[in-house]
A protein has these predicted regions:
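Short, intrinsically disordered C-terminal tails of secreted or membrane-associated proteins
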Residues: 218-221
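A polyanion-binding, active-site-adjacent surface
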Residues: 2-196
Length: 223
């Protein structure tokens, strides 16, 4: 009798169960481990972010804070659209709230990347667009570099990646210093998101190119 092969959704569910039971860095987490992700094998958009904040740790819902409100506004998505896991996957670089350091949250713990990230990415075959939100995600995927030029030169990384600043309260100050973000980047971001959600349906609806161009940067392993 042949062994039954696990389907990709079953494999993802089994792996997520292991992730949510992980205690590899429990000793370093002031509020204890609570991995917070939103993943489905059908998702076409992946948000690679930093790490949950303290409010998100309490709710267990990714981006259930002011940063999430700002990110959804940038993306042009309603809360219902954003939390539709069949379309939008959310996987931070660190899955748990890392605590505080200096004037803000501590950097995401590195254990999640080493233990889980590649395994999870392999089970997200439908992803067309990955949003790299903040410096930690950008450096992991793209290598060393500054956030602002990567955001401004977003076309260099399409159609696979789209770099964004972290949507914390500090991003308002950053936006005031960089007015091209709302003028040039956000319209292109929203167009890229609709293309990732609907594929050729959006293109055939009569929409223009919105400055996205057709030649994307070769994919970088990760996601």
């Amino acid at each position: 009798m042949k062994a039954r092969h696990e389907s990709r959704p079953e494999a993802l569910a089994a792996l997520l169960a292991k992730v949510r039971a992980c205690s590899a860095c429990a000793h370093a987490l002031p509020l204890g481990p609570r991995p917070i992700l939103q993943l489905s094998t059908s998702a076409t958009i992946l948000i690679a972010s930093q790490a949950p904040g303290s409010k998100v740790h309490q709710t267990g819902v990714p981006f259930s804070d002011v940063s999430g409100d700002r990110l959804r506004e940038w993306m042009g998505l309603s809360a219902d659209e954003f939390y539709d896991e069949e379309t939008v996957a959310i996987m931070p670089m660190g899955f748990c709230y890392p605590g505080r350091s200096g004037g803000g949250d501590a950097p995401p713990r590195a254990e999640c990347v080493h233990l889980w990230r590649d395994q999870l990415v392999q089970l997200l075959p439908a992803v067309r667009l990955t949003l790299l939100v903040g410096s930690y995600a950008q450096q992991h995927i793209l290598g060393l570099g500054a956030v602002t030029p990567r955001v401004r030169n977003f076309r260099d990384y399409l159609p696979t990646y789209f770099s964004l600043p972290h949507p914390s309260w500090r991003s308002r100050i950053w936006e005031e210093k960089n007015p091209w973000f709302r003028g040039d980047v956000l319209p292109a971001l929203r167009s890229a998101i609709q293309r990732a959600r609907y594929g050729d349906q959006e293109r055939n609806s009569g929409g223009g190119t919105d400055g996205l161009g057709s030649a994307g940067r070769p994919g970088v392993s990760g996601g």
